[in-house]
């Protein structure tokens, strides 16, 4: 392992940290900074970074089919919590109907 490999792994770690900070800021800005949404966002971030790490390590080992498999499997897995987090964060609040004092027939 040379210095460039170490720098790549450090860059992936910093990218994971920055993405998680962005998810936190996004959810806080929407007013939906809850633990379940944070966990769901973390899972999306983890699988995305893991897919990138899998791709890089497979490329360095010259296993080109493993790159595609990692992107399909882990990248596809990252889409599920990412979509759930995005949809729940942008879900509008339910409107409460005001009850009237009169009875309509």
Swiss-Prot record:
Record keyword Hydrolase present: no
Subcellular localization: Cell membrane
Keywords for the protein's UniProt record, in alphabetical order: Cell membrane, Membrane, Transmembrane, Transmembrane helix
S-S bonds: none
Coiled coil: none
Membrane topology, as annotated: Multi-pass membrane protein
GO cellular component terms attached to this protein's record: plasma membrane
Major subcellular location class: membrane
Superkingdom field: Bacteria
Record has Membrane as a keyword: yes
Transmembrane segments: 3-23, 35-55, 66-86
Family of the protein in this entry: Belongs to the PceB family.
Function: May act as a membrane anchor for the tetrachloroethene reductive dehalogenase PceA.
Name recorded for this polypeptide: Probable tetrachloroethene reductive dehalogenase membrane anchor protein
Organism: Dehalobacter restrictus (strain DSM 9455 / PER-K23)
